[in-house]
Amino acid sequence: MTGERIEKVKINDEFAKSHFLTTQWRETKRQRHYKMPVTEQGLRERIESAIPQVYHIIVTDLSYGCGQSFDIVVVSDFFQGKSKLMRSRAVNKAVKEELQEIHAFSCKCYTEEEWSKIVV
């Protein structure tokens, strides 16, 4: 009889553990569900606050408002003398938190002089 009781306690403990894990997963899923999506305006504000001398910013949500795919163009003299990699890193650092929620992200960075040659 003592052996049966110990076995039942083990089963109950396993059930409690599995129930606890399931509950944790549901709470995590619920928390993810209520997060605000990334917006064009939010990305624009983050970039403007992090990168000095911003001349022009174009943020386009390619996911039709879902906040999952963005195309960004940043024009600033801050990029003068910096390689494409360093420019992209500066923008990525500015939107680091938002990048965790985004599925696709494209960024093009130009100086004012380079931008004036592109846009005629």
Swiss-Prot record:
A Pfam family: BolA
A cellular component term from Gene Ontology for this protein is: iron-sulfur cluster assembly complex
GO MF annotations, alphabetized: 2 iron, 2 sulfur cluster binding; iron-sulfur cluster binding
Q: Where in the cell is it found?
A: Cytoplasm; Nucleus
Q: Which GO terms describe its biological process?
A: cellular response to iron ion; intracellular iron ion homeostasis; iron-sulfur cluster assembly; negative regulation of transcription by RNA polymerase II; protein maturation
Q: Which UniProt keywords apply?
A: Cytoplasm, Nucleus
**Additional detail:** Present with 2050 molecules/cell in log phase SD medium.
The similarity comment for this entry is: Belongs to the BolA/IbaG family.
What's the subunit arrangement here? Interacts with FRA1, GRX3 and GRX4.
What is the role of the protein in this entry?
Involved in the regulation of the iron regulon in response to decreased mitochondrial iron-sulfur cluster synthesis. May be involved in mitochondrial organization and biogenesis.
Could you identify this protein by its name? BolA-like protein 2
- Origin species: Saccharomyces cerevisiae (strain ATCC 204508 / S288c) (Baker's yeast)
Taxonomic lineage of this organism? Eukaryota, Fungi, Dikarya, Ascomycota, Saccharomycotina
